[in-house]
Amino acid sequence: MATTTSCSLLLSSTLFLHSPPSSHLSFFNLSSSRSSPISLYPIRSKRYFRILSKLSLNDNNRDDDDDTLHFTPFSAVKPFFLLCTSVALSFSLFAASPAVESASAFVVSTPKKLQTDELATVRLFQENTPSVVYITNLAVRQDAFTLDVLEVPQGSGSGFVWDKQGHIVTNYHVIRGASDLRVTLADQTTFDAKVVGFDQDKDVAVLRIDAPKNKLRPIPVGVSADLLVGQKVFAIGNPFGLDHTLTTGVISGLRREISSAATGRPIQDVIQTDAAINPGNSGGPLLDSSGTLIGINTAIYSPSGASSGVGFSIPVDTVGGIVDQLVRFGKVTRPILGIKFAPDQSVEQLGVSGVLVLDAPPSGPAGKAGLQSTKRDGYGRLVLGDIITSVNGTKVSNGSDLYRILDQCKVGDEVTVEVLRGDHKEKISVTLEPKPDES
């Protein structure tokens, strides 16, 4: 291939001087700064060689015969001829070089299209990020010198659109202590928000904004009961104020338990994930690979306050019931037994399993049903109260088990409580009531 190319170039340069009868070419004098044109006309061979023999370096030598070749000195054409020959030879050597051929194998090709999983992630983000909002928590402060009342940003967090009526779901700790709340949608429009209601025990709150319905994109709601460890999850939020940030990971664990930041009450069945969750992600959605909501990002385990690969989300099955009550009634009507119980560690030291009743006020459901409190006798000796071992046939080993069972009940439900009283067991029927401050 290289030989053929070089030969073709040499032949072309030769034919350039031996033009066929019908040709007429113009180019520039390579040896002159004047760039005067050179013309080639048809000639006869004998006449051609005779003219070449008379050519000199004098540019004024001309032949005025009809068959004249109007030509600059041959010295002007010679460099061009040599240049063509050199180029042909160089190209021949270059094409034949094996080093160049081997190097060509490493040329970077045009980037290919995104892979299938990448396209799915991009599509998931584009479809769901319009549902995610940025929440600014403003607190009222009074200037010590001017006594002016100022609104100072106290914190920020994330949330998501629940419905077309403008309800926004987030964490309670995101809005706690706020005097003024503002919600920024994906198109950067900002609206004042009002608190519809909140559940401190589960760290869930619902806000409402007066926004046009065409600006509201409710998030698709999924289920969390059938989640599996290892499946992909996606978190969208505003970490450190960086709005609409996507992080990915997997479900690292299920049925975890964390405590409510407001009340200390345990939140059960929490989802653990290694998707990066940082300050500002609180209240944002955790999505499965189909783009449906499976949890609310609420906490991280980190000594430094930044993501350490251990994040927690409240499962959507828990959130759904709470949000429905908050939207309808502005509060959560959660059933209670009406008791105070001992820390789990204290019961473990007794060598028994269950929940030790410390106090069952007579006005509460458990007190009305006859559950006994822990007390001291006339000699000052401690007399243990009832130890709850099961509710409706479900074993109760600690306080978390009791809360989990009650979360599945409603106000007015009658439950059967089995207790250990002294050295014997008893079953007592208790009618559940709402918390006094929620009635």
Curated annotation (Swiss-Prot):
Enzyme class: hydrolase
Main location: plastid
Location in or out of the cell: Plastid, Chloroplast thylakoid membrane
Membrane topology: Peripheral membrane protein
Domain PDZ: 326-423
Region Serine protease, annotated ranges: 154-323
SUPFAM superfamilies on file: PDZ domain-like (SSF50156), Trypsin-like serine proteases (SSF50494)
Keywords noted in UniProt: Chloroplast, Hydrolase, Membrane, Plastid, Protease, Serine protease, Stress response, Thylakoid, Transit peptide
GO cellular component: chloroplast; chloroplast thylakoid; chloroplast thylakoid membrane; cytosol; nucleus; thylakoid; thylakoid lumen
Active-site residues annotated for this sequence: H173 (charge relay system), D203 (charge relay system), S282 (charge relay system)
Activity modulation notes: Inhibited by phenylmethylsulfonyl fluoride and O-phenanthroline.
MF terms (GO), sorted A to Z: identical protein binding; serine-type endopeptidase activity; serine-type peptidase activity
GO biological process: photosystem II repair; protein catabolic process; proteolysis
Function field: Serine protease that is required at high temperature. May be involved in the degradation of damaged proteins. In vivo, can degrade beta-casein.
Assembly mode: Interacts with PTAC16 and other potential targets for degradation under high light conditions.
Family: Belongs to the peptidase S1C family.
Listed name of the protein: Protease Do-like 1, chloroplastic
